[in-house]
């Protein structure tokens, strides 16, 4: 049975969880099979920056980091579910959330 794989990326964990809960509500309303949300490892991007050279030539570094949280949800394909997912405004802050949809054939859910 074909299914829809939804990958969600965000730097804001609360917003990510809110979107995942909204997707779970839509799937529960339609009654299709769902697997997930599967949390993937958090990607941490670090940027070391030389702040100043201290007393006697010692170097002082600042480190800035950005955490990217990821989730995967697999949903059995159903026309009604896909239409509801596309029509419902899932994201309130689009600059913080990225969603990828992938249609996968011939795999059991």
UniProtKB/Swiss-Prot annotation:
This is Small ribosomal subunit protein uS10. Keywords: Ribonucleoprotein, Ribosomal protein. One of its GO terms (biological process) is translation. InterPro entries: Ribosomal_uS10 (IPR001848), Ribosomal_uS10_CS (IPR018268), Ribosomal_uS10_dom (IPR027486), Ribosomal_uS10_dom_sf (IPR036838), Ribosomal_uS10_euk/arc (IPR005729). The gene is rps10. One of its GO terms (molecular function) is structural constituent of ribosome. It comes from the Archaea. It comes from Nanoarchaeum equitans (strain Kin4-M). Belongs to the universal ribosomal protein uS10 family.
